[in-house]
Regions:
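Bacterial Sec-dependent N-terminal signal peptides
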Residues: 1-22
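Extracellular/lumen-exposed scaffold segments
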Residues: 20-148
């Protein structure tokens, strides 16, 4: 019975610890001239954890990636920019140069709305967080941002 209680306690402790290691996401759209919007998708990892850049090479950790859903009223312009404190180093485990964000990462995408109408842009972001000892499995977050 003591062993069963111990196993239950360990599952509970690790389950709670893992549940707390999630990225907090926030989304906003800033109106620009000529029906353009600057989309901000901000990732805030838990203290002591970091999120990887979109520019992580093959063979490295899972890069942050964005997939925008099709919307006939919205044109996604060029590539998404990244803002934040970037740390670059050679990762001995992956044997590649990696980039991650220390603290918040602001991913910025410019879009154009066809016409002067209200619509939205939706999609999903896949990311992975790590600390100096371990990584969490990649996770996917859906988003929907109003453009009005």
């Amino acid at each position: 019975m003591k062993q069963l209680a111990f196993v239950f306690m360990m599952v509970l402790v690790f389950g709670v610890a893992n549940a707390q290691q999630k990225i907090s996401w926030s989304y906003s759209a800033k109106k620009l001239p000529n029906n353009k919007y600057e989309i901000h998708i901000v990732a805030t990892p838990p203290p002591g954890w970091h999120i990887y850049s979109q520019l992580t090479p093959d063979g490295g950790p899972v890069p942050t990636t964005f997939k925008f859903s099709k919307n006939a009223l919205v044109v996604v312009q060029s590539k998404m920019n990244e803002k934040g404190k970037v740390v670059s180093y050679f990762d001995k485990n992956f044997k590649v140069d990696v980039k991650y964000f220390e603290g918040k990462a602001d991913f910025v995408q410019v879009v154009t709305v066809k016409g002067n109408i209200k619509t939205n842009i939706s999609g999903e972001v896949e990311s992975m967080i790590c600390n100096d000892r371990t990584c969490m499995p990649p996770s996917t977050e859906k988003f929907n941002i109003a453009l009005n």
